Design a protein with these regions (language model features):
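Conserved alpha-helical scaffold segments that buttress catalytic/binding sites
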Residues: 1-186
Length: 186
């Protein structure tokens, strides 16, 4: 687990930077179950042996410098991956997706599964290439990302027709919220 307390890309309501702290505070109530958690429905124990969850703290964010903050994020994710661990990143706004995905370039043919109301495929919203409205477009530009599946898309006004056309031309699978409601999740 690593926190990325960054929300400078947020255009409306800030506060996502407090996400890592909030999750840690809430999870501290359940920190006593070192042997894992038993699920009576599945009749299985989760997050017990051999799993080990490590809190790596927060990425160093310089709240006036997006580039350096994103470099710090990318470096932290690369370090976690180099230890053969799976990073679970707590944000932060959608803009943090880009440096996180960039760090995964040690793998080939990755598929990104994106749950969101918005397409996040804008070219450079408000002149910002690595903002919260464009991480899926940035992902499509990365050689190690071979597929993007977007689930729950419904946000009218968050993307233009050309953004949807570009996403479809890239090969994204777009499943709208209406399709999810109609077809269910199984």
């Amino acid at each position: 687990v690593i926190g990325m307390p960054y929300d400078l890309g947020t255009s409306v309501n800030t506060g996502a930077r407090f996400g890592p702290r909030g999750v840690r505070e809430a999870s501290s109530y359940n920190c006593y179950a070192h042997e894992g958690w038993y699920d009576p429905i599945r009749k299985e124990t989760f997050l017990g042996e051999p799993w080990k969850i490590v809190d790596c703290g927060n990425v160093d964010v310089l709240h006036t410098e997006q580039t350096r903050s994103f470099q710090n994020c990318e470096a932290a994710i690369r370090k976690i991956l180099s230890k053969k661990a799976i990073p679970f990143v707590i944000g932060g706004d959608h803009a943090i997706t880009t440096p996180i995905l960039r760090a995964f370039d040690c793998f080939d043919n990755l598929c990104v599964i994106h749950f969101d109301a918005h397409l996040d495929f804008s070219k450079n919203p408000h002149g910002i290439a690595e903002g919260p409205g464009s991480p899926m477009r940035r992902a499509s530009e990365m050689a190690h990302i071979s597929k993007i599946v977007q689930i729950g898309i419904r946000g009218i006004g968050s993307s233009q027709l050309s953004d949807f056309q570009d996403a479809e031309a890239y090969g994204n699978t777009i499943i709208t919220s209406r399709e999810v409601r109609r077809n269910g999740v199984e």
